[in-house]
């Protein structure tokens, strides 16, 4: 698999190099040089998740990894299901929260851990990543206890749910967590500064586990196929997928699936009040505002890292950006949507609720809608209980960590401090 850097296409790497490096020079994103079209979509959709995913990732990555190695990586990573649940006649929820940390990022985080272990070579590696909630838990649990891999996770202090924080800030060992006095964009900016410091990168073997790492992104492609595979065959012709969007890695993965040949008619990017992309698609003016805190905190991102990959896919495929649907919901609208969904018999959380409502508003009569449920409702226990006036029991995975003490350090939004912390 050959990849190039979107900013500077002359900088090219193979899959192993892209996994090890995470980002290119000058914070450049790596992207596959070619995405081969699959010709046997119906046969693939008839296969179980793991076997189908082995074939999809084998096609994308090519012969760089031995087939037995890649097949084992997929089997070890995808140890849980992604059920498609009917919410109403033509709308389905793809539940991506049945993994060990109850969020969609278990797919990408676990596959990346397998990939890095397979290609890392000698020497220690430091994973540095920023999280607005779910990435931290998925990465921490995927890499916890792996030899010669240290993990440092930055997150905005006071801006993620207490349960999210407990899920990844209680492990210790090779997992260090840092609460930054700033928002998620500040955390991302610190990560990017670290990657631009060549001396630091070399000294600690720096890598990233955000969706900027290609291995995470490729793993996420697989659950879009799983969604369509679970639809009745008569409903596969006009499929519309609504993606709750913050950093836009999830949407990028869906667009790669469409490029491979998965029959998805169109996508909708659904955001909260941090609506840089919906405003851009409407006006043509890229104008990020200051990030605001919302109920759907994992989407509190006003400068999405993966947007260049989205535009690259549209350009390469000859698609028109105006065909990408978008919409946003305020916190008040999100609360009303959660109540309406619960009245229909479906318990959701803020991110999934936004994706559902924007889909419902834009879905046509002859279309089948799928919205992505990216986290278990219990990960947002306080909000969901308050909005729906119910008592939400904690799943075992959350309950266990909820009883443990936080092990986080605290730091100002200051790269010099972070650099010293990483080197010690």
Which residues are covered by each model-predicted region?
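PLP-dependent amino-acid enzyme catalytic core
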Residues: 1-424
């Amino acid at each position: 698999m050959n990849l190039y850097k979107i900013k500077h296409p002359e900088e090219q790497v193979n899959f192993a190099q892209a996994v090890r490096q995470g980002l290119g020079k000058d914070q450049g994103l790596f992207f596959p040089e070619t995405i081969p079209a699959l010709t046997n979509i119906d046969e693939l959709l008839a296969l179980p998740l793991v076997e189908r995913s082995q074939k999809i990732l084998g096609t994308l990555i090519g012969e760089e990894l031995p087939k037995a190695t890649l097949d084992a990586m997929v089997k070890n990573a995808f140890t849980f299901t992604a059920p498609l649940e009917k919410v109403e006649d033509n709308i389905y929820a793809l539940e991506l929260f049945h993994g060990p940390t109850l969020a969609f990022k278990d797919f990408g985080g676990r596959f990346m851990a397998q990939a890095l272990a397979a290609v890392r070579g000698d020497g220690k590696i430091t994973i540095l990543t920023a999280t607005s909630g779910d990435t931290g838990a998925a990465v921490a649990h995927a890499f916890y206890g792996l030899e010669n891999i240290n993990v440092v996770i930055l997150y905005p202090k006071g801006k993620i749910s207490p349960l999210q924080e407990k899920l990844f800030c209680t492990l210790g060992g090779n997992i260090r967590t840092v609460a930054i006095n700033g928002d998620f964009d500040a955390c991302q900016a610190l990560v990017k500064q670290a990657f631009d410091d060549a001396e630091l990168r070399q000294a600690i073997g720096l890598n990233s586990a955000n969706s900027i790492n290609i291995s995470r992104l490729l793993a996420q492609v697989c659950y879009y196929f799983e969604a369509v595979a679970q639809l009745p065959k008569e409903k596969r012709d006009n499929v519309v997928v609504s993606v709750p969007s913050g950093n836009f890695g999830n949407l990028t993965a869906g667009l790669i699936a469409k490029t491979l040949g998965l029959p998805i008619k169109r996508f909708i990017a659904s955001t909260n009040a941090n609506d840089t992309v919906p405003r851009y698609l409407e006006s043509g003016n890229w104008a990020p505002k200051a990030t605001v805190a919302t109920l759907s905190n994992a989407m509190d991102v006003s400068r999405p890292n993966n947007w260049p990959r989205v535009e690259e896919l549209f350009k390469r495929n000859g698609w028109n950006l105006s065909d990408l649907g978008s919409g946003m919901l305020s916190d008040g609208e999100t609360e009303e949507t959660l109540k309406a969904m619960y009245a229909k018999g479906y318990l959701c959380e803020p991110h999934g609720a936004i994706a559902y409502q924007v889909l419902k508003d834009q879905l046509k009569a002859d279309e089948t809608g799928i919205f992505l449920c990216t986290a278990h409702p219990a990960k947002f226990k306080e909000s969901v209980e308050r909005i729906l006036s119910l008592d939400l029991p904690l799943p075992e995975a959350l309950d266990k960590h909820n009883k443990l003490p936080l092990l986080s350090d605290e730091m100002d939004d200051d790269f010099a401090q972070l650099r010293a912390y990483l080197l010690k």
